[in-house]
Amino acid sequence: MDHLIQFWPILKRLIIYAIPWKKKIILAFFLLLSGATSEVLGPILISYFINNILSQHQLNFQLILIIIVIFIMLQILAVFFNYFQSILFNKIAVGIVNKLRNDVMKAALNQPISEFDSQPIGQMISKVTNDTEVIKELYDTVGPTFFRSITLIIIILFAMFTLEWHMAIITIFIIPLVIIVMSIYQYYSTPLLRNVRYYVANINNKFNETINGMNVIQQFRQQTRFENNIKESSELHYLARMKILKLDGFLLRPLLSLLSALVLCSFMFLFSYFSIGVYEVGVLYAFITYLGRLNEPLISITIQQSILQQAIVAGERIFSLIDSPKQKYGNNEEEIKSGKINIKNLSFKYKESGENILNNINIYIPSKSFVAFVGQTGSGKSTLANLLMGYYPIKHGKIYLDDKSINCISHDVLRKNILMVQQDPIVLADTFSSNITLGKKISEEKIWNVLKTVHLSSLVQSMPKGIYSILGEEGNNLSLGQKQLLAIARILVRNPKILILDEATANIDSGTEKLIQTTLSSIRAKTTLVVIAHRLSTVIEADMIVVLKKGKIVELGTHKQLLEKKGFYWKMYNFQLFNC
């Protein structure tokens, strides 16, 4: 019964998003009411014509002309009002969904990094795009259709009771039956629609995985396997949709049509008990017409029930993201001035049930020193770098920056003073300038100075538009080494107090590595430099080298001191030296 409990809270939250548009919504409902009233008045005119003109065999052409003109005017007004209310509701829907999509994106941007470790990217993309588009139909289709249908039902029933209350009472019995049908539909459709939304997100995730890994897929001839995976996901989505369609086909239009037919038979049965006069023929015509008109909004409401359920399920997925815990930071706005780091009794694991990645790490890094962390894959080097960046909450032990606990420092101060260059740099499909500034106001002179520092100025000068030259998707017109240098330029223009390089030279050629080493040498006097290194040749000049093994510090010292010990570092260095 959980899906029934969640229906109203989610619908209420979705309705709250419409409050800023209340003036336009009121105007749209006025147009909707006017259009519905214009539609309903038509059969009353025809009934009047049959009962008062046709039955009397006295053709008053002037009155007939007036009735015809009024009837045509009512139809024109109905079209006019319905057109403009449709345009207005669509405009409102787009505005609401734009706000909702912005909120979803804001929530995604403030998710803890740990969420991206466990959540497939396709699921996140589906929430931002597909689910918000489904919710759009709630505002531009379900809402207007529902209120238009309710308005029509009320006006039609009022007209029916005005004409003949016996027959109107029979008609009203169809409404509780419709409510029962809608309740049954909601009960059975919600879990099916959840499956549909899940399979859509799963297909998006597999497409994302396939496109991003296309080089590897083609290299290892895995096209057939990935094609079959996507086919399997599509088949599951198809089967889930078919279950919904079968439910729609049974509970929606066909069942309501049957109910309407039963009501019509009741009309005929009741009509047979009265003397058959022309007046009764006019009434019967009006009731048959109204029954057809009544059938349309009832069917519309039940059909919209399917779209409403899809919107509720999509809303459930979206609000689960919006309501999820955000990355927590401290409130201390005091700037980091020296850049010294003190790590005390630090232990860390990604999952509560998992094993420790880091175990009782203790180290002091002086201001403006060059410290390297080395070790085999899985030793905890990158985890330590992520903790220094404040990406994960620290529960066991402490990291102090300028004698302040990292858990107490504000997000703005952390991001301003501690920056990282990663192994796989992110390059935007934008200009050199935009990739360096990232929206921050920085002078052209400063951009050119930092490009000279990272030895990219000659490359940029050779391009037609210089720093305003557009880079390709993910910077595909740059080499990996050039991307890495650009990433370093992006960091240097901000003058961080602490600079972390996480395997920044692991995948580049020796020439680019030398350029990076030269760049780092030029900034050593300005910042605390923390290097996570795979190639030991890149950290020979470090003031201190920390050797990690299975999350523990096993050795500590300068390059010369560690070689003299002939321990774990000595073995690693000689292995790389003689196997290069």
Curated annotation (Swiss-Prot):
Q: What is its main location?
A: membrane
EC class of the enzyme, as a word: translocase
**Could you say which residues bind ATP here?**
G375, Q376, T377, G378, S379, G380, K381, S382
Keyword Acetylation listed? The answer is no
Kindly state which keywords UniProt assigns to this record, in alphabetical order: ATP-binding, Cell membrane, Membrane, Nucleotide-binding, Translocase, Transmembrane, Transmembrane helix, Transport
Domain ABC transporter: start-end pairs: 341-575
- Does the record carry Cell inner membrane as a key word? no
Give the matching SMART domains: AAA
Spell out the reaction equation it catalyses.
ATP + H2O + xenobioticSide 1 = ADP + phosphate + xenobioticSide 2
Q: Which residues form the ABC transmembrane type-1 domain?
A: 25-310
Give TM segment ranges: 26-46, 61-81, 142-162, 165-185, 258-278
Coiled-coil residue windows: none
Protein's name in the database: Multidrug resistance-like ATP-binding protein MdlB
Question: Which source organism does the UniProt entry give?
Answer: Buchnera aphidicola subsp. Schizaphis graminum (strain Sg)
- Gene designation: mdlB
